[in-house]
Amino acid sequence: MTSKKYFTTLTLCSLIVFCLSLNAQIDPGVYISDVDNVRHELKITDGYMTHSVYETSPAKFIKTTGGFYTVQNGSLDIKLEFNSNFENDGQKELSIPFAMEKGQLTLKGDSPLVFTQSKHVKQELDGQWLFATRGPDTGQERRGDENARKTLKYLQDGRFQWIAYNTETFKFHGTGGGSFSSQDGAYIEKIEYFSRDDSRVGAELKFDYELKDGDWHHRGKNSKGEPMYEIWALRK
């Protein structure tokens, strides 16, 4: 191979690698960045993500955002469904430069953050669930993606988050999250952040669950100790 052909081939290879890096996809999973006492937590699936920020000790909720994303030219472009700080910043869209390498995700905003991907933990209730109705199911009207008022519960790799919001008005009604387990009909949450009441952090809530006709039937007592029976539908 002549020197000219060699350098031409090398240049083409470098260009291909560069183009691939610009359009690199983000591996689905949970990503954590701990900076001093502040935790940033990302949950990412194909096309959807949430970002929650909270202090760990003492517990204090800071903010959460989430929505549908695309990756283009090294940028994470997000069309938000919810933004807990919307009344202050008015943001409905975000565009964040990023890099993905060896299980680490770097968001290159004004203050770059390096996230480490958490271990994959597969459980029966993994997925994104929308609140449908109160149980028992007697054929009553249900809420779904067509409704502006939504309550989403996002379960992934042993981490959970619920968010109540309105996609038309962008009014934010609350969120909470932490770790969870779902096994043999027992669903357990351990709260690590809660926008409505920081004092609830550390509480462990136990529920019964059953999957029936694709729905999640969720029974037990809520954070106030009141009986509850909810039916959640898997978001598609």
Label each residue range with its predicted role.
Residues M1-D27:
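Bacterial Sec-dependent N-terminal signal peptides
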Residues L22-N73, D77-T175, A186-K236:
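Lipid interaction determinants
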